[in-house]
Amino acid sequence: MQQTLPVTRVSPRVRSLQRFEWPALGLPVTLMLLLVFWQAGVTLSGYPAFILPSPALVAGRFWQALSSGLLWQHTLATLSAALGGFTLALIIALILGYTLAHIRWLEQALAPVLAASQAIPVVAVAPLIILWFGAGLTSKVLVAALITFLPILINTVVAIRSIPRELIEMAYISGANRWQLLRYVEAPLALPVLFGGVRTGLALATTGAVVGEFVAGRVGLGALINIARGLFDTPLIFVALATLALITLTLYVLAGLLERLLVRWEAS
């Protein structure tokens, strides 16, 4: 005898809970746990404030630096260098990556050079860049571009290579030219993989800008950390580090939102 199972209707509230992304709770919970352990470490260790400041002391220093305009000045300098370096690296990496994905012999010729370049830390190259281009914004942009370039390049090559060959052949059979192939086939299909490199590149661009500021910067969050270290202003160091983390997180989230918008636009 065949039995049928009863159909259970799921209420909209339950469906909304099922669609709820529990990882969204990760950041607030992590921050709360970090603050709890931080305060516990301050209380139990007994370290003075210039070694391990309390969260309340750092929050007060943050407001002081923000209201005085000091934090804005250094944050905008770091953000300008990071976005400038990212933009430069993105343009070069997209053009070169697309070329390497289609020209095998060129990829084989440049692959050893690109691999060897990664053995040299950017921190070691930064003094040379500053020596050649000065201690201004240009050198920081170049340092940020250097550290950002390779992840975007690799993801560009992988994204183009991952497109099924059959789709490319069908596009050519349909009479598509090179531009139409890029616009209607390669670009939409490569976006998800490509944006993985973009998000990584944005995070690394901030690191590159700070490296340049550490070496010879008079303005920027890296320079602010150097200044605070010389003054034994440990709360200000924590403020600069928290600001860097906030910048990186914001850029990462914005890149994810941009990816969703572009994917929806291409799908429509």
Swiss-Prot record:
Pfam families: BPD_transp_1
Keyword Transport: yes
Compartment list: Cell membrane
Induction entry: Expression is probably regulated by riboflavin, via an FMN riboswitch.
Chief localization: membrane
One of the protein's GO biological processes: transmembrane transport
Domain of life (superkingdom): Bacteria
A single GO cellular-component term on record: plasma membrane
Gene3D superfamilies: MetI-like
Transmembrane segments: 24-44, 76-96, 119-139, 140-160, 185-205, 236-256
Transmembrane helix as UniProt keyword: yes
Membrane topology value: Multi-pass membrane protein
This protein's UniProt keywords: Cell membrane, Membrane, Transmembrane, Transmembrane helix, Transport
Domain ABC transmembrane type-1 per the UniProt entry, residue ranges: 75-255
Complex formation: The complex is likely composed of an ATP-binding protein, a transmembrane protein (RibX) and a solute-binding protein (RibY).
Family the entry assigns: Belongs to the binding-protein-dependent transport system permease family.
Summary of the function given for this chain in its UniProt record: Part of an ABC transporter complex that transports riboflavin into the cell.
Name of the protein: Riboflavin transport system permease protein RibX
Organism: Chloroflexus aurantiacus (strain ATCC 29366 / DSM 635 / J-10-fl)
